[in-house]
A protein has these predicted regions:
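Nucleic-acid enzyme cleavage-core boundary/entry regions
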Residues: 1-157, 162-167
Length: 168
């Protein structure tokens, strides 16, 4: 309990930062798995976070991830990704992100993970965004958009299920 209380005092949100929850756990408990979901320490940590944020205890996995993110914590930043196309991203200085701009201009897909999204201030698009879960459908739509040079449609592919990177 003491370790969790100490960790709560060092949540990244206190410094307006973001950190991987495994790294956070390792720094404060010497165990990267200390705050894995379904552990007692995670349960205590989550209760402390909801207390500080003045929100109800989360009922779903998505709600848990949202609360963790508000506290400055996120799950695995690399494997938590989605694919996007024809979306423009802007950095913390409200400047176009050059990597995203290149994929946008060439009508190509970009796999975006949580670590990538940490440096994005906002994302803009055209008139519509189609969100699909199937990569083959995503690829077919992108080919059609590219072939016909349709500029007013953006795409997001969740690759089977909605993870937190797609939600953001």
């Amino acid at each position: 309990v003491y370790v969790v209380m100490k960790a709560l005092n060092h949540l990244p949100m206190w410094e307006n930062k973001k950190e991987n929850i495994s790294i956070f756990a390792s720094l404060h408990t010497k165990n990267p798995h200390a705050f894995d979901k379904n552990t007692f320490a995670y349960y205590l940590l989550m209760h402390g976070i909801v207390y500080f944020l003045k929100v109800d205890f989360p009922k779903t996995n998505l709600e848990q991830n949202e609360i963790l993110y508000r506290a400055g914590l996120y799950q695995d930043g690399i494997s938590n990704y989605c694919s996007v196309a024809r979306l423009q991203a802007f950095n913390e200085n409200n400047q176009p992100h050059l990597g995203w701009a290149g994929f946008y201009d060439s009508y190509e897909a970009l796999n975006v993970n949580m670590d990538n999204l940490l440096h994005i201030h906002f994302i803009t698009c055209c008139n519509r965004v189609y969100i699909v879960e199937n990569p083959s459908v995503f690829q077919a739509l992108l080919k059609k958009i590219k072939k016909e040079e349709i500029e007013k449609i953006g795409l997001v592919c969740t690759n089977g299920q909605l993870n937190y990177s797609a939600y953001l």
